Amino acid sequence: MTKALIVFASMTGTTEGIAEILAQDLRELKIDTLVKECTELYPDEFLDYDICVVATYTYGADGDLPEEAEDFYYDMEEVDLTGKVFGVLGSGDRIYKKFCPAVDDFDEQFEKSHAIRGAEPLKINLSPDQTDKENIKQFARDLVTTSSKVQKPK
């Protein structure tokens, strides 16, 4: 069975909620899915999963990574995720000049780790509305479709 790990950083609960919506969508697609907060694990735990996801918020007007996610972000530099499928999604506020740059930062970090993009980065303004929930469902489908095309080691 295909396994997914969703790692999240959430200050107000919004991004955790987004991670849970994605987890439910993946489970409906028959993916064994685990959701964990970024402070509860190290990036090398992604090695035990086929699909690797980060759900993050962006902090402040300068578009910073969440402080609690910084160690996880930098530790990702040490992990080779070749053959793993990844996706990044998160929330931000369009009032700021930079919208969800933490999503882009994690997306780039996955690329540097040699993972395979399974879905385009998904950015949600504030909290998910019905359209966002449909986009999350499509994000899940894209991850699963890409994962099904990746040659699994024997």
Residue ranges of model-derived segments:
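FMN-binding flavodoxin-like domain, especially the glycine-rich phosphate-binding loop
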Residues: 2-3, 14-17, 25, 29, ...
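Short acidic active-site motifs
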Residues: 40-45
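Short, hydrophobic/glycine-enriched beta-strand segments
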Residues: 4-9
